């Protein structure tokens, strides 16, 4: 029996030791669970609270404890007893409640407790220093049992809070370091944008940038020789607000604006071709085709000199887009080649926005208004077509009507070769062709016909009846002249009389312009055709004679 009793006592003792060991489990999870919420509650008595000068110190705490015990001993002689309390230890700190009323007497947070001291003379007494700077207090407490478990719980609480705080700070530091790394990375990118090495445009100092159309895209890139790997590329995002658009490109010399056309000083200078758009000089003013497709349809021969389309020759599509379509205009600069584009360009069939002059009004609508020197045909000949100079007109040099009629018949027979829809082909233009004299006689006679009234069977779509060319009764009729149409030629005697009456007019035309084409004589206000002074169709045989000075004298 004794042995069984001893075994039972041993089991109970071991169970108590196990329970104590379980109470001594001070893992982090256990401590968190222990101090969570209200925490651990202990029964005690409040010895007293004393103000101290410092936040910590064993000597300081021991002196304060002895002082408070002396006060309690004096009160006990008077019959007063210590206040019974219970205190709780939690994450919120130390709370002291009145045992009788349960009211909260004192609350000291963990961060306010600066020092914990144990009484070496009494194992049930301990104290702690708390308060803020300049207001420190020492609280002395006497526990119902040993004060060591309370002190250990306070130590564990402070250690746990310290570790949790340290871990939180490490996490915050790690997150902050990560943010700092991102900020540093972003700062590096921003500094690279401000760095002149990584500018979009890099120019050498003191040199103007060379704009090459083929390598223009390569200019606006970061130089590959100074480009770092991947990370330091110029970002595609918007620049920083502190960096303006000009600061982004650095000190850049702005190239001159070569695309804007210069402002014309005078109306005459507006149509002078620039160095990049100079038209090739050609003696063949009207080009390979007598008239541009967009200006005058095929088969039409207008009265007077037909103005070619201003943009008949289109060397480049870009030139037409920049300058825009203009109505037919001819400019003659002093001492320069007449500016007119009669040649068909790369795109002769392009529809022009401005309608041509020949199709807007009847051919004779403005004939009576051309009273003084219209000179449209002479403007297109210029100094580059030096034909035979017409001498002064006089009665001795003018041929008689009898010699003029055979020439008219021969010219009419020559003109019959051109009754077709398109004019005859012209030899290819060469730079050494000085004038129309290099072409065939038939081709020259075809152009001499421009501005002269035609027969109705000449594929002319104009209404001949609208031309105010009334035949004048001849004062000296000739019996040998064949019957000629009235619109083609008036009476030779009337023309001779008109020349004889006003010889100064011909001299002005001959001295001022020296042009082989005198189409203004066909556009006189009275409608008479002063073409009896020479052959209007030229010499068929191609040999000059005294009577036929110029192949275009009458046209």
From Swiss-Prot:
Alphabetized PROSITE patterns for the sequence: PID (PS01179)
Localisation per UniProt entry: Cytoplasm
Region (Disordered): 1-26, 384-410, 418-437, 468-555
Modified residues annotated as Phosphotyrosine in this record: 198, 220, 232
Biased composition (Polar residues): 391-403
Biased composition (Basic and acidic residues): 15-26
Biased composition (Low complexity): 470-479, 487-501
Location, primary (coarse class): cytoplasm
Biased composition (Acidic residues): 504-513
Alphabetized GO MF terms: signaling adaptor activity
Record Pfam families: DAB2_SBM, PID
Alphabetical list of InterPro entries matching this protein: DAB1/2_SBM, Dab_PTB, PH-like_dom_sf, PTB/PI_dom
GO biological processes: neuron migration
Cellular component, GO annotation: cytoplasm; intracellular membrane-bounded organelle
Magnesium is among the record's keywords: no
Phosphoserine modifications at: 491
Record note on modification: Phosphorylated by FYN on Tyr-198 and Tyr-220 upon reelin induction in embryonic neurons. Also phosphorylated on Ser-491 independently of reelin signaling. Ubiquitinated by various cullin-5-RING E3 ubiquitin-protein ligase complexes (ECS complexes) following ligand-binding and phosphorylation, leading to its degradation. Ubiquitinated by the ECS(SOCS7) complex in the cortical plate of the developing cerebral cortex following ligand-binding and phosphorylation by FYN, leading to its degradation by the proteasome. Recognized by ZSWIM8 through a disorder targets misorder mechanism that eliminates misfolded DAB1 via ubiquitination and proteasomal degradation.
Keyword Ubl conjugation: yes
SMART domains, A to Z: PTB
Keywords assigned by UniProt, alphabetized: Cytoplasm, Developmental protein, Differentiation, Neurogenesis, Phosphoprotein, Ubl conjugation
Domain PID: 36-189
Function: Signaling adapter of the reelin-mediated signaling pathway, which regulates the migration and differentiation of postmitotic neurons during brain development. Mediates intracellular transduction of Reelin signaling following reelin (RELN)-binding to its receptor: acts by docking proteins through its phosphotyrosine residues and PID domain.
Domain-related comment: The PID domain specifically binds to the Asn-Pro-Xaa-Tyr(P) motif found in many tyrosine-phosphorylated proteins.
Oligomer status and interactors: Associates with the SH2 domains of SRC, FYN and ABL. Interacts (phosphorylated on tyrosine residues) with CRK and CRKL (via respective SH2 domain). Interacts with DAB2IP, SIAH1, LRP8 and VLDLR. Interacts with LRP1. Interacts with APLP1 (via NPXY motif). Interacts with DAB2IP. Interacts with ZSWIM8.
Protein name, UniProt field: Disabled homolog 1
Species in which this protein is naturally found: Macaca fascicularis (Crab-eating macaque)
Gene giving rise to this polypeptide: DAB1
């Amino acid at each position: 029996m004794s042995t069984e009793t001893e075994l039972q006592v041993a089991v109970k003792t071991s169970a108590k030791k196990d329970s104590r060991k379980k109470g001594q489990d001070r893992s982090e999870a256990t401590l968190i669970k222990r101090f969570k919420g209200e925490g651990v509650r202990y029964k005690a008595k409040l010895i007293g609270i004393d103000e101290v000068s410092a936040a910590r110190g064993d000597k300081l705490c021991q002196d304060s404890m002895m002082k408070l015990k002396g006060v309690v001993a004096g009160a006990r002689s008077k019959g007063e007893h210590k206040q019974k309390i219970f205190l709780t230890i939690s994450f919120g700190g130390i709370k002291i409640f009145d045992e009788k009323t349960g009211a909260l007497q004192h609350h000291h947070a963990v961060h306010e407790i600066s020092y914990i001291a144990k009484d070496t003379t009494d194992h049930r007494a301990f104290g702690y220093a708390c308060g803020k700077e300049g207001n420190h207090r020492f609280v002395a407490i006497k526990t119902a049992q040993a004060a060591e478990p309370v002190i250990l719980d306070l130590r564990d609480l402070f250690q746990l809070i310290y570790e949790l705080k340290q871990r939180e700070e490490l996490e915050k530091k790690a997150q902050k370091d990560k943010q700092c790394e991102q900020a540093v990375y972003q700062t590096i990118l921003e500094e690279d944008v401000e760095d002149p090495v990584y500018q979009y445009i890099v120019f050498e100092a003191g040199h103007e940038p060379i704009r090459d159309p083929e390598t223009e895209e390569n200019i606006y890139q970061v130089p590959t020789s100074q480009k770092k790997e991947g990370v330091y590329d110029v970002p595609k995002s918007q620049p920083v607000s502190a960096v303006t658009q000009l600061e982004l490109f650095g000190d850049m010399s702005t190239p001159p604006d070569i695309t804007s056309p210069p402002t014309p000083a005078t109306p005459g200078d507006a149509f002078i071709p620039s160095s990049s758009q100079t038209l090739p000089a050609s003696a063949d003013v009207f080009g390979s085709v007598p008239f541009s497709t967009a200006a005058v349809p095929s088969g039409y021969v207008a009265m007077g000199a037909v103005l070619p389309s201003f943009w008949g020759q289109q060397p480049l599509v870009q030139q037409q887009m920049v300058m825009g379509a203009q109505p037919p205009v001819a400019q003659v600069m002093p001492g320069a080649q007449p500016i007119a584009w009669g040649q068909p360009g790369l795109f002769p069939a392009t529809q022009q926005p401005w309608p041509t002059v020949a199709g807007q009004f009847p051919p004779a609508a403005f004939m009576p208004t051309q009273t003084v020197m219209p000179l449209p045909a002479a403007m297109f000949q210029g100094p580059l077509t030096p034909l035979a100079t017409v001498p002064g007109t006089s009665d001795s040099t003018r041929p008689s009507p009898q010699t003029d009629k055979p020439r008219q018949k021969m010219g009419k027979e020559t003109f019959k070769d051109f009754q077709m829809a398109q004019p005859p082909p012209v030899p290819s233009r060469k730079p050494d062709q000085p004038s129309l004299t290099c072409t065939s006689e038939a081709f020259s006679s075809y152009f001499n016909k421009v501005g002269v009234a035609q027969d109705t069977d000449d594929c002319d779509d104009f209404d001949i009846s609208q031309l105010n060319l009334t035949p004048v009764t001849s004062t000296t009729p000739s019996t040998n002249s064949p019957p000629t149409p009235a619109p083609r030629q008036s009476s030779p005697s009337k023309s001779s009389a008109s020349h004889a009456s006003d010889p100064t007019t011909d001299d002005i035309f001959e001295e001022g312009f020296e042009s082989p084409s005198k189409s203004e004589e066909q556009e006189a206000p009275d409608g008479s055709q002063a073409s009896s002074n020479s052959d209007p169709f030229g010499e068929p045989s191609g040999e000059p004679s005294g009577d036929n000075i110029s192949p275009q004298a009458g046209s």
